[in-house]
């Protein structure tokens, strides 16, 4: 028997993480395209991972409501999603927190260290955009970390459901 509240909450959090990641990296891809620079492989990888996560959540919810949600497929799918999320998390953390020239280094050096700015100008709009991009990177990193933890949690919850079902029939 699946714990309803925990499963619902974890699936909701996983869906939100997937949706935010898809939106974030789609926006990054759009910006890279407009800047006419190459698009890193992990942008597409994380868009695909977020999309697979949302599909997983929708399928799990449908199977739960028709009483066909089995623990073993959930454990396997959650583990695979964990590997995908962890791969994206490692690559994003290298880009965000890596050595000199990383995203965070550039944000601190060129965006946050500047003096006062404001007023009605194109420069103000550019600064708002720059801060938004810096914050979006940190948000994407946080969502990837949360999705990794939630995937493991769902995997362990499925394992507990499977163990409880075995004990009941032994």
Which residues does each PLM region occupy?
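Functional transmembrane-helix hotspots
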Residues: 92-112
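Secretory-pathway extracellular proteins and peptide precursors enriched for disulfide-bonded cysteines
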Residues: 99, 123-126
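Juxtamembrane membrane-interface segments at transmembrane-helix boundaries in membrane proteins
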Residues: 34-46, 125-142
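Intrinsically disordered terminal tails
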Residues: 1-8, 63-68, 107, 112, ...
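Membrane-interface helix-loop junction between the first two transmembrane segments
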Residues: 26-36
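Membrane-interfacial segments
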Residues: 33, 100, 163-166
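Signature of small four-pass
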Residues: 4-21, 25, 39-99, 147, ...
């Amino acid at each position: 028997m699946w714990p309803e509240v925990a499963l619902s909450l974890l699936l909701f959090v996983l869906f939100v993480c997937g949706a935010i990641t898809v939106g974030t990296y789609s926006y990054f891809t759009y910006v890279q395209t407009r800047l006419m620079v190459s698009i890193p492989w992990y942008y597409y990888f994380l868009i695909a991972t977020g999309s697979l996560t949302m599909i997983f959540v929708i399928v799990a919810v449908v199977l739960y409501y028709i009483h066909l949600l089995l623990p073993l497929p959930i454990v396997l799918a959650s583990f695979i999603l964990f590997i995908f999320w962890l791969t994206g998390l490692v690559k994003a953390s290298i880009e965000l927190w890596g050595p000199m020239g990383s995203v965070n280094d550039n944000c601190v050096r060129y965006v946050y260290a500047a003096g006062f700015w404001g007023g009605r100008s194109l420069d103000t709009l550019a600064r708002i955009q720059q801060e938004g991009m810096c914050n979006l990177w940190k948000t994407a990193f946080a969502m990837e970390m949360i999705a990794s933890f939630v995937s493991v949690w769902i995997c362990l919850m499925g394992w507990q459901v499977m163990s409880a079902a075995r004990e009941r029939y032994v």
